[in-house]
Structures are given as structure tokens and as C-alpha cells.
Amino acid sequence: MRDRYSVIVGLIFLAVIVVAAINTLGGDGEGEGTLGLDRMPARWALPAFAVPAATGTLEGDANVAQDDCASSAIPCPHADRRDPACRIPPAGAIRVCDLFDRPLVISFWFDRGGECVEQQDVVDSVYRRYRGRVNFLSLDIRNDRDAVRDLVGERGWEMPVGYDRDGAVSALYRVGVCPTFAYAYPGGTLQSAGIGEIGAAELSARVEDLLAATRRAERS
């Protein structure tokens, strides 16, 4: 029985790794890995992006064009390309830079097995508790837009929900597991990341850790 259990656990872990490998898009060889699964550089600067609000009428793919042209690892606009993500008109869009004024929690999810939809119920409940102190963004990856819009209404989510139609943000952030969480300091640098389903108490504890880390950083 113990051997059978070990085999099952091993297969589950292998499946997680395979899914991560399939969904992760590496860059130019620097800093490759899966967010929440592999070690990220300290205070990694979250790349800019803008996505349509899931319940809105704005159509189109995510804008992942960056302001910083010194980096070749992320898309950087030239004069003939679209405006950087954080400079587009805000109407109908969620610009991640607008969320950098407070500590930030981003929940990346897709509806391909597991309990990722139910996990967003947990995220929404914690969002309501910390609203005004911590910013939250629930980011759907590549699901049907109408289905996501219906989910928001049916489940009564109040948190901001963005729509990454073509998976560009997922690739930029190296998301390979559902759900994936990114916890960021004000200003948009990574404090920590995690993968897998968690309950409201554990997510609240992670948010409290983020708030405490933010206070320490502000004092230093």
C-alpha cells in the first residue's frame, strides 16, 4: 500500500512538472523557470502588461510591450509598434502598473482541470478582507471570454478579473501551474510566489507576510 501511494504521489508531481514545462515560455536563456516553482531573482521587477477587463467590452490580446528598452528579454516597442502597456488609454483595460501603488497579489488561472475556478472564490474572499490595503488581480489565461464573464457574475466575484486571451502575460511571467500566485511589493517587485490550491487562512497568512515584508522594506 505504501509503495502504491508513493507511485501515485510521484505521478502527480511528474504531471505538475510536465504541465509547467508545456505552459512555460523561456526567454533568451536568462532567468528561465516557472513562477512559483523555480527560484526567481530577489526583488524581480514584474514586467508591465495591460489586459482587457474580463467583464468589459474591450477586445484584443494582452499588451506586454515594455517601457524599458534596455532589456532584450521582454518585448520592447519601437516607433512603429504599439504603445507600452502602461501608457495605453485605461478605459476598459487593467494596467498592472496602476496596481503598484500598494502591495499586490496576482492569481493566474486557467480552467483546464483541477479546482482553479473554486480557488478564485477563495481569492475573492481574501480580496474583500484586504480591499483598500492590498491590490488583487485575478488573471484568466486563454479561456472563453463569455465563459469567464459568466463565471464572474454567477460567483459574485468583486475582485478585478483580467483576460489574457492569447497567453502573452502567462508566457511573460513564466506561469506553468494553475493556480500560480505572485506577491509583489509596492512599486512592482516580487516578494514571493507560490503554486497550488490554498485555503483562505493560508492565503491570508501569505498576504500578512507580504504586508510585514513591505513594512520592513519601507523602514530600511
Segments predicted by a language model, with ranges:
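A short beta-strand-turn-helix
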Residues: 50-104
